[in-house]
Regions:
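Flexible, compositionally biased loop and terminal segments
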Residues: 1-199
Length: 199
């Protein structure tokens, strides 16, 4: 016979939205969820290859998974989600695969913009955005501008991003400020460095 606690949990689950009900049933405390989740979107090509499928098909399935991740994160009330979608190393893949990934990114932005608006999601992008094809940059910038004032979850897309490249960028900015007298090198703190990183 089920205990009182189990009965109560089952009753509460029936009154909650599906995602929260699932979390309650698994015993996860909604008050102890993180405020920022970061996910490296990796392995789509390998997933497809293991199933004797085209790598590009794997990336298409990965794009579908992104929708689920964004929806779940938003429903949980997690304020910030960062998806590492395309690294600086990804430029070394075949031109066909890179082209397919850029096309997928553009389609994703176009199809998900209305969803972001409806759910108050604010889009942000980090990385060497200037390396993306111009048409992709245009759609990305339009989506960022359209969602800029949305008060809900922040979705960061890391595109043409690498942590080493970010450190180099931050170091160059600080060095340039120091050389032009706008920054005293002795005043550099952890906070100064954090303020010059993407997020």
């Amino acid at each position: 016979m089920p205990s009182t606690a189990k009965k109560r949990k089952k009753f509460l689950s029936s009154k909650l939205p599906p995602i929260e009900a699932t979390i309650l049933e698994k015993g996860i405390d909604l008050h102890r969820l993180p405020v920022h989740v970061a996910i490296i979107m990796d392995g789509n090509g390998r997933w497809a290859k293991l199933r004797l499928l085209n790598r590009i098909y794997g990336h298409e399935k990965g794009a579908e998974t992104v929708r689920t991740i964004v929806t779940t994160t938003r429903e949980l009330g997690i304020p910030t989600l960062t998806l590492y979608a395309f690294s600086t190393e990804n430029w070394q893949r075949s031109s066909l695969e890179v082209s397919a990934l850029m096309s997928l990114l553009k389609k994703f932005l176009e199809s998900e913009k209305p969803v972001m608006m409806e759910n108050n999601i604010r889009l942000n992008a980090i990385g060497q955005i200037e390396r993306l094809p111009q048409d992709v940059q245009d759609v990305l910038n339009q989506t960022i501008a359209a969602t800029r004032h949305n008060p809900g979850m922040v979705l960061n897309l890391a595109l043409s991003y690498g942590s080493r490249a970010e450190i180099v960028r931050m170091t160059r900015i600080l060095a340039e400020k120091a050389m032009t007298g706008r920054l005293d090198p002795q005043s550099i703190t952890e906070e100064t460095i954090a303020a010059h990183l993407y997020t």
